[in-house]
From Swiss-Prot:
Spans traversing the lipid bilayer: 148-172
InterPro entries listed in its UniProt record: Glyco_tran_10_C, Glyco_tran_10_N, Glyco_trans_10, GT10-like_C_sf
Stored PANTHER family: ALPHA- 1,3 -FUCOSYLTRANSFERASE, ALPHA-(1,3)-FUCOSYLTRANSFERASE 4
Location(s), subcellular: Golgi apparatus, Golgi stack membrane
Keyword Transmembrane helix attached: yes
Name by which UniProt lists this protein: Alpha-(1,3)-fucosyltransferase 4
Membrane topology: Single-pass type II membrane protein
Cytoplasmic side: 1-147
Skewed-composition ranges (Basic and acidic residues): 88-106
């Protein structure tokens, strides 16, 4: 599956990397499988050992006798790559570890047996043809000075480079453009925001943002005055405001409300909304070339009224889905070489982390999968809950980010599980705050399209909540292994999407790039709910 974060590049400069390099490498295999004395909630309770962990986590934590060795302890765990089992391959792993942390998802990992077989082969002399008797016997065969490599080797090398380039293009060529990717042409475009997202229909409009200053997108004319409807090349409709309250479409089809009773928000009756949308789709003479953009940042489980929207009513979609016409995720990683990046030494020191697991939840619902999993996990490890409802306590005055920064792990549990639905719970509450996210949402492969595999822990990697708890406690006792979950900070920084101005500017950018190509959405509900 294609990933949406760029290639890693190690920046210069010192920071927490020096602290990590000087830290002692503790041996995970020395853990006995039972909790020793420690903080409250972590002692006196038996938990499963490495046998119940996923293969790529358990192999590195086994004692040496389980790997066929003798007298040597296991190597520290690498959450980003599978461990190697031979001494020669272990040296290779230590030399290539930074590159392997961000290896492409387009290539499968090499089985451990292959590494053992490779380590057992005799060393081939440099320049000797593959399969020659000299190479098989481990001898050396010298070429005459000045001749260089045979032409067959050069041809094979060129063919290999060509194949690599083609595979790279196939894996990366069709990715949706990242928001910081390329400069934008300066074609003048007017974009009208029909309602401000999450602010309600009748809130006072804020001044439009400067897209050139915020996102280096020029030629944008952002509009809030509905009298400018005929001048706009695109009109944004926020789904939540679209399906609540009386119909409020562009004139002359919209119903204008004037009294307090009329502006009271309510979910439209299905037949009423469907009839209004169908009439609008079939009889609306829009200005030439104008696009209606459906905008939504909620999951299908929390998007009522989808099926009441008529076919061909909208031209584009704007959402967190990567296959939207305008892709605006809740956040993303970008290379630190980008101008204005914060300094690289941002990994929080372990001395400030006084708690183990934190969770901030605003809507408590016992029917949700995240609440059910919390009840299972809290039986084996202490979880401090903040927010409204359930066992939550108020967020301290220092704020959410500073509170989460005091914990080693954060439960980035989504309220529903859908494709690409990865919200601020991962980007802001965990990655930006400096805690290792434990995620519950779409599958691991979906997460790895947006973040490196070694930057998070997925609940699906473990057969049970008790097995996950044992792994979290293992990381708590092995700080050198825990720090590996912050390797991505060497090369990337976190961008948090602003839902006031960023969708506005991204639509302007998309119109500039698309030109006058016509399009309409035939069945919005079937696309979004799949």
């Amino acid at each position: 599956m294609r990933r949406l974060w760029g290639a890693a590049r190690k920046p210069s400069g010192a920071g927490w990397e020096k602290e990590w390099a000087e830290a002692p490498q503790e041996a995970p295999g020395a853990w006995s499988g039972r909790l020793g004395p420690g903080r409250s909630g972590r002692k006196g309770r038996a938990v499963p050992g490495w046998a119940s962990w996923p293969a790529h986590l358990a192999l590195a934590a086994r004692p040496a006798r389980h790997l066929g060795g003798a007298g040597q302890g296991p190597r520290p765990l690498d959450s980003g790559t599978a461990p190697f089992h031979s001494r020669a391959s272990g040296e290779r792993q230590r030399r290539l570890e930074p590159q392997l942390q961000h290896e492409s998802r387009c290539r499968s990992s090499t089985p451990a047996d292959a590494w053992r077989a490779e380590a057992a082969l005799p060393v081939r002399a440099m320049g000797a043809p593959w399969g020659s008797p000299t190479a098989a016997a481990g001898g050396r065969r010298r070429w005459r000075r000045g001749r260089g490599l045979p032409w067959t080797v050069c041809v094979l090398a060129a063919a290999g480079l060509t194949c690599t380039a083609l595979i790279t293009y196939a894996c990366w060529g069709q990715l949706p453009p990242l928001p910081w990717a390329s400069p934008t042409p300066s074609r003048p475009v007017g974009v009208l925001l029909w309602w401000e997202p999450f602010a309600g229909r009748h809130s006072a409009p804020r001044p439009p943002p400067d897209c050139r200053l915020r996102f280096n997108i020029s030629g944008c004319r952002l509009l809030t005055d509905r009298a400018s409807y005929g001048e706009a090349q695109a009109v944004l409709f926020h789904h939540r405001d679209l399906v609540k309250g009386p119909p409020d479409w562009p004139p002359p089809w919209g119903v204008q409300a004037h009294t307090a009773e009329e502006v009271d928000l309510r979910v439209l009756d299905y037949e009423e909304a469907a009839a209004a949308a169908e009439a609008l789709a079939t009889s609306s003479p829009r200005p030439p070339g104008q696009r209606w953009v459906w905008m939504n940042f909620e999951s299908p489980s929390h998007s009522p009224g989808l099926r009441s929207l008529a076919s061909n009513l909208f031209n584009w979609t704007l959402s967190y889905r990567a296959d939207s016409d305008v892709f605006v995720p809740y956040g993303y990683l970008y290379p630190r070489s980008h101008p204005g990046d914060p300094p690289s030494g941002l990994a929080p020191p372990l001395s400030r982390k006084q708690g183990l697991v934190a969770w901030v939840v605003s809507h408590w619902d016992e029917r949700q999968a995240r609440v059910r999993y919390y009840h299972q996990l809290s039986q084996h490890v202490t979880v401090d809950v903040f927010g409204r409802g359930g066992p939550g306590q108020p967020v301290p005055e220092i704020g959410l980010l500073h509170t989460v920064a005091r914990y080693k792990f954060y439960l980035a549990f989504e309220n529903s599980q859908h494709l690409d639905y990865i919200t601020e719970k991962l980007w802001r509450n965990a990655l930006l705050a400096g805690a290792v996210p434990v995620v519950l949402g779409p599958d691991r492969a979906n997460y790895e399209r947006f973040v490196p595999r070694g930057a998070f822990i997925h609940v699906d990697d473990f057969p049970s909540a008790s097995s996950l708890a044992s792994y979290l406690l293992f990381l708590d006792r092995n700080p050198a292994v825990y720090r590996r979950y912050f390797h991505w900070r060497r090369s990337y920084a976190v961008h948090i999407t602003s839902f006031w101005d960023e969708p506005w500017c991204r639509v302007c950018q998309a119109v500039q790039r698309a030109g006058d190509r016509p399009k309409s959405i035939r069945n919005l509900a079937s696309w979004f709910e799949r």
